[in-house]
A protein has these predicted regions:
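Extracellular ligand-binding/catalytic regions of CAZymes and related secreted enzymes
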Residues: 100-105, 112-156
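Structural recognition of the beta-strand scaffold that forms the well-ordered cores
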Residues: 5, 10-15, 22, 68-69, ...
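Aromatic side chains
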Residues: 4, 19-21, 37, 46, ...
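Catalytic beta-strand/loop cores that center a nucleophilic Ser/Cys/Thr
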Residues: 44-117
């Protein structure tokens, strides 16, 4: 992964990718630790999540980014809302999530790691994959990180 990123190749991180390399010294044999991966590469600051249960409302922070092309209106997620704030300097938040009684948190953003384009989302609960907005988000993320043109219309 380090060589991939050093070569300027893109990366998409979903959900638990934010803490995949931080085993806190408890990793299995052969596990490579990279405790700074979340902040350095993804641009996040994962420090836990809210309890599963409340539905997360997801809204755009901007309509002008190619990753958001064709995504109309707010949508919801049944997954636990992650707490990645504050994002690293240089990360660009695209979507914010909120649950009742808690502050909003970024749930999708872009970052640059060297020459590598990076997209991360804390969404990705199994039910999210049934959402047309989430599927469009992921398609757009692939297109943006790889330099392809974005979709121009929402999918049914």
């Amino acid at each position: 992964l380090r060589a991939h990123l050093a070569a300027g190749k893109p990366l998409i991180g979903v959900r638990t990718a934010s803490h995949a390399f931080d085993a806190r010294g408890q990793g299995p044999k052969g596990h490579a630790e990279w405790p700074g991966f979340d902040a350095e590469v993804l641009g996040g600051n994962y420090h836990g999540h809210h309890p599963t249960g409340p539905t997360t409302s997801v809204v755009s922070t901007t309509a002008r980014h190619p990753v958001l092309a064709g995504i109309s209106g707010p949508f919801t997620s049944k997954g636990a809302l992650y707490m990645p704030s504050p994002l690293a300097k240089g990360a660009t938040p695209l979507l914010m999530g909120s649950i009742p009684g808690k502050k909003s948190e970024p749930v999708a953003w872009t970052n640059q790691f060297g020459k590598a384009r990076v997209f991360y989302t804390s969404l990705g609960h199994e039910s999210d994959f049934r959402s047309p907005q989430f599927r469009q988000l992921m398609e757009n993320a692939v297109r943006w990180t790889t330099g392809m043109k974005s979709a121009v219309a929402a999918r049914p």
